[in-house]
Curated annotation (Swiss-Prot):
Enzyme class: ligase
Protein name in the entry: Glutamyl-tRNA(Gln) amidotransferase subunit A
HAMAP family the record matches: GatA
Matching Gene3D superfamilies: Amidase signature (AS) domain
NCBIfam families in alphabetical order: gatA
Organism listed in the record: Thermoanaerobacter sp. (strain X514)
Keyword list, A-Z: ATP-binding, Ligase, Nucleotide-binding, Protein biosynthesis
Signal peptide (residue range): none
Lineage: Bacteria, Bacillati, Bacillota, Clostridia, Thermoanaerobacterales
GO cellular component terms listed in the entry, alphabetical order: glutamyl-tRNA(Gln) amidotransferase complex
Length: 488
C-alpha cells in the first residue's frame, strides 16, 4: 500500500507512531503528482520546495509533541484561495502572475496546524463553470475516464483527490462547485453552512453564495478537516459566531429513526436512468439501516437555476469590476485613453464564460430590468428558503442525486451554456438557501461514479456527517479510477 493512497486518519496513525515521517509522506505525494499529473492536468502550480520545507517543520512539531489532527498532512488548494507568496490565478489571464501578499484565513488555519501545501488546483475561470473547461490554462481530465470532465468549478481539486495527488483538497462552492465535481470524480465533497467557514482571502465570485469546503477520500477525513477550517473570523463580515463542535463525534453508524426526506423534484426530467437507479438503491440502504424515508416536496426549487444565474451573475458583475488593470492583475499594453485601457484590459483578461456572466449580471441590474430580473430572483430565493424550512419540519435531512448525470465528455457541452448550467440543477438551491450539503460516492453507472447528496438544516453538519458515515460504512464504495493506471 503506497502512502499516497491512505486517508488522513490512516496517515495520522502512522505519523503519531513515528512509523513514517511527514517528509516521507510528502515525497510520496510529490512522486505521485509527477506520475499522474501529465495525464489529468489538475494543478496550475506545484510548490515542491515549499512543501518539503513545511514537511521538515511538521516533523519537528511531531517530535516535540505539538502535533494536531492535520500535522504533516498534504493538501492541494483551489487556485482562487489566496496563498501568500504563491501564485493565485483563478485560472484567468487577468491574474496570471498575481502573487497575494497574504494568506486566506483557511490557509492560515491549515498552516498553523502543520499542513503541507503541495500546490494549487485548476478551476473554471473565476469559479464560473461546471466542467473546468473554462480555465485559461488547461482542461482538467476526469481520472475515471480521461475523455470526460471532472466537473466544476473545483474540478482540479476533485480530480487531484480521486487520483491521490493529495490527502485532501480545498474548493469553493457557489452553486455546486464542490459537490458536483466530487460526485463526478467519486470523492467526498462538502459545502458547509454559509458563514461557517471564513471567506477572507477567497477571490469573490458571488459573495452571498460562495463558501469554502473540503474534498476528502472518506467521510471521517471530511469531519477532521471541517474541525480545523470552521470558526468565526472578524476579517469576514459574513462569518458567524457559533460554538465549535467536534464533528468526528457524529461519525456513528446508528441512524435508526432518523427521518430522511426524498424530494420528488430531485428526480425529474433530465436525470439519467443509471443515476436515478443508483440513488434509489442508496435510499434502500438507508432504509435498511433503520431510517424513516419520507416523501417531501420543494415546489419552488424548479426556479432555483434561473434565480441562481441572475443573482450570481449580478454579484459577479459587481465583484469583477475591480479588475481594471490599475492596481494589480493584467493590464493592456496598447490603448488610447483611460476608458479604452479598461475596455482592452478586460477584453484581453477575461474569458468567454466570465464575459457572458458579467454581461448577464449587468443587464439584470440595469435600471430598466432590475425589478423584472434581480428583484424577482431575490423573491424566489426567499420562497426556496421557506420551502426548505417547511420540508425540514417533516424530516431531519434531505437526500437525492448530486448531479443529474455522470461525467460528460470534454467538449460535449462547450457550445451549449444551458446544457452546462443544468449540471448544477440539484445543487444551486442549497447555496440559495445557505444550507450545508455533502456529496458522497454511492455507486457506479456505466463505470462512472454517482454522487448522493445529503442536505441538512443550517449548522446541522453533524447530522449530515452522521448519515453520510452510516451510509459509507454500509455501502463500502471501493471502486477506484483506472484511467490513470489504476490509482490506489
Amino acid at each position: 500500500m503506497e502512502l499516497y493512497s491512505l486517508t488522513i486518519h490512516e496517515l495520522r496513525e502512522l505519523l503519531k507512531k513515528r512509523e513514517v515521517s511527514a517528509l516521507e509522506v510528502t515525497k510520496s505525494y510529490l512522486e505521485r503528482i509527477k506520475e499522474v499529473e501529465p495525464k489529468i492536468d489538475a494543478l496550475v502550480t506545484i510548490t515542491e520546495d515549499f512543501a518539503l520545507q513545511k514537511a521538515k517543520e511538521a516533523d519537528e512539531k511531531i517530535k516535540k509533541g505539538e502535533d494536531t489532527a492535520l500535522t504533516g498532512i498534504p493538501v492541494i488548494i483551489k487556485d482562487n484561495i489566496s496563498t501568500e507568496g504563491i501564485k493565485t490565478t483563478c485560472s484567468s489571464k487577468m491574474l496570471e502572475n498575481y502573487i497575494p501578499p497574504y494568506n486566506a484565513t483557511v490557509v492560515e488555519k491549515l498552516l498553523e496546524e502543520g499542513v503541507i501545501i503541495l500546490g494549487k488546483s485548476n478551476l473554471d475561470e473565476f469559479a464560473m463553470g461546471s466542467s473546468t473547461e473554462n480555465s485559461a490554462f488547461k482542461t482538467t481530465k476526469n481520472p475515471w475516464d480521461l475523455s470526460r470532465v471532472p466537473g466544476g468549478s473545483s474540478g482540479g481539486s476533485a480530480a487531484a483527490i480521486a487520483a491521490d495527488e493529495a490527502a485532501f483538497a480545498l474548493g469553493s462552492d457557489t452553486g455546486g462547485s464542490i459537490r458536483q465535481p466530487a460526485s463526478l470524480c467519486g470523492v467526498v465533497g462538502m459545502k458547509p453552512t454559509y458563514g461557517l467557514v471564513s471567506r477572507y482571502g477567497l477571490v469573490a465570485f458571488a459573495s452571498s453564495l460562495d463558501q469554502i469546503g473540503p474534498f476528502t477520500k472518506d467521510v471521517t477525513d471530511c469531519a477532521i478537516v471541517l474541525n480545523t477550517i470552521i470558526g468565526h473570523d472578524p476579517k469576514d463580515s459574513t462569518s458567524l459566531k457559533i460554538d465549535k463542535p467536534d464533528y468526528t463525534s457524529y461519525l456513528k453508524e446508528d441512524i435508526k429513526g432518523l427521518r430522511i426526506g426524498v424530494a420528488k423534484e430531485f428526480f425529474g426530467e433530465g436525470i439519467e436512468e443509471g443515476v436515478k437507479e443508483t440513488v434509489q438503491e442508496s435510499i434502500k440502504v438507508l432504509q435498511d439501516l433503520g431510517a424513516e424515508i419520507i416523501d417531501i416536496s420543494i415546489p419552488y426549487v424548479e426556479y432555483a437555476l434561473p434565480a441562481y444565474y441572475i443573482i450570481a451573475s449580478a454579484e459577479a458583475s459587481s465583484n469583477l469590476a475591480r479588475y481594471d488593470g490599475i492596481r494589480y492583475g493584467h493590464i493592456a499594453e496598447k490603448y488610447e485613453d483611460l476608458i479604452d485601457m479598461y475596455m482592452v484590459t478586460r477584453s484581453e483578461g477575461f474569458g468567454k464564460e466570465v464575459k457572458r456572466r458579467i454581461m448577464l449580471g449587468t443587464y439584470a441590474l440595469s435600471s430598466g430590468y432590475y425589478d423584472a430580473y434581480y428583484k424577482k430572483a431575490l423573491k424566489v430565493r426567499t420562497l426556496i428558503k421557506n420551502d426548505f424550512e417547511k420540508a425540514f419540519e417533516k424530516c431531519d435531512v434531505i437526500i437525492g442525486p448530486t448531479s443529474p448525470t455522470v461525467a460528460f465528455k470534454i467538449g460535449e457541452r462547450a457550445n451549449d451554456p444551458l446544457a452546462m448550467y443544468l449540471a448544477d440543477i440539484y445543487t444551486v438551491s442549497v447555496n440559495i438557501a445557505g444550507l450545508p450539503g455533502i456529496s458522497i460516492p454511492c455507486g457506479l453507472s456505466d463505470g462512472l461514479p454517482v454522487g448522493l447528496q445529503i442536505i441538512g438544516r443550517h449548522f446541522d453538519e453533524g447530522k449530515i456527517l452522521n448519515v453520510a458515515y452510516a451510509f459509507e460504512q454500509a455501502n463500502k464504495f471501493s471502486a477506484k479510477p483506472q484511467a490513470i493506471g489504476g490509482a490506489r
